[in-house]
Amino acid sequence: MPRRLQQRGAGVKGPPASTSRRSHPASASAPRSPPAATTKPLLRWDEVPDDFVECFILSGYRRLPCTAQECLASVLKPTNETLNFWTHFIPLLLFLSKFCRLFFLGGSDVPFHHPWLLPLWCYASGVLLTFAMSCTAHVFSCLSLRLRAAFFYLDYASISYYGFGSTVAYYYYLLPSLSLLDARVMTPYVQQRLGWHVDCTRLIAVYRALVLPVAFVLAVACTVACCKSRTDWCSYPFALRTFVFVMPLSMACPIMLESWLFDLRGENPTLFVHFYRRYFWLVVAAFFNVSKIPERIQPGLFDIIGHSHQLFHIFTFLSIYDQVYYVEEGLRQFLQAPPAAPTFSGTVGYMLLLVVCLGLVIRKFLNSTEFCSKK
């Protein structure tokens, strides 16, 4: 059976032998019909190349190769990729409308090109790009094996780009308001609670200096790991990708520590509620992405509607929705008493450099002979 119908190492039994490609002796003598889309628009798992088969998804596959026009038309047909597209295309439109209101229709005295909004531009570009690339990858994944790999490499890169853009927004809009990163608060706090006579000024300065460079390195490393997970050495690609994309979330640890050490719920209830609700949605999304429930329980029943990747999309959308909410609130507080304006090199410059690095990573993997398609 194809290696993609079950997760390697998971010990999951596949379909019975009667469904195998080699169990159709009658089909050998029967005349073959031309592979026209009108003859058989949707295929089963044993009628497509192994590299296109998804875990526990038995039907709903588009014929291969498709043309670009056929790929676009398939978003209105009941395939196993249709809702993968719509569960991110609708959020893309919602967030596009949201950011247009923030930048152009917010009624603020700050123009859209003001340096104070540069971190928001970085964050917005990451959110919109990750949804756009996800839609593109799911729609055009059946053009060819190489293009499928290329689109999903770009999908992984866009997620890393979004993660770094989130860190830029946190760095300028959220972290400065935390007591945890205020030496005037932390120095007496450490002395009172731990009895340590430590001046936290230097430690906090070092942390601030390292946040963006470390997040940058993590973004590149996560993309490399996810691209590598599409090769045959990786037994659990979904678990690996989930883990590596959890790593950049560590950049938000100061907010979590703030809620433990200080009264974040009382001082900033919006941040507290939406921050923890976001991480709840992320945990739920990770559960579905790794477990492959519900299609693992009943293969074939959720091929078109309700399989785990669609649920993963929905819960990641909810997590980003909560994040946008508290980033917007952080922006409002930032504009009330802004410190020094963010620089172009410290915001957009970082993002452009990241684009170059991620492009080089994708180019390296596409030029290698060892690539394989695993969503």
Swiss-Prot record:
Protein's UniProt name: Membrane progesterone receptor epsilon
Q: Where in the cell is it found?
A: Cell membrane
Q: Give any Pfam family that matches.
A: HlyIII
Q: Which ranges make up the Cytoplasmic topological domains here? A: 1-84, 136-160, 225-241, 321-341
- An example Gene Ontology CC term for this record: plasma membrane
What ranges does the Extracellular topological domain annotation cover? Answer: 106-114, 182-203, 263-299, 363-375
Which residue intervals make up region (Disordered)? 1-39
| Its job | Plasma membrane progesterone (P4) receptor coupled to G proteins. Seems to act through a G(s) mediated pathway. May be involved in regulating rapid P4 signaling in the nervous system. Also binds dehydroepiandrosterone (DHEA), pregnanolone, pregnenolone and allopregnanolone.
One example of the protein's molecular function in GO is: steroid binding
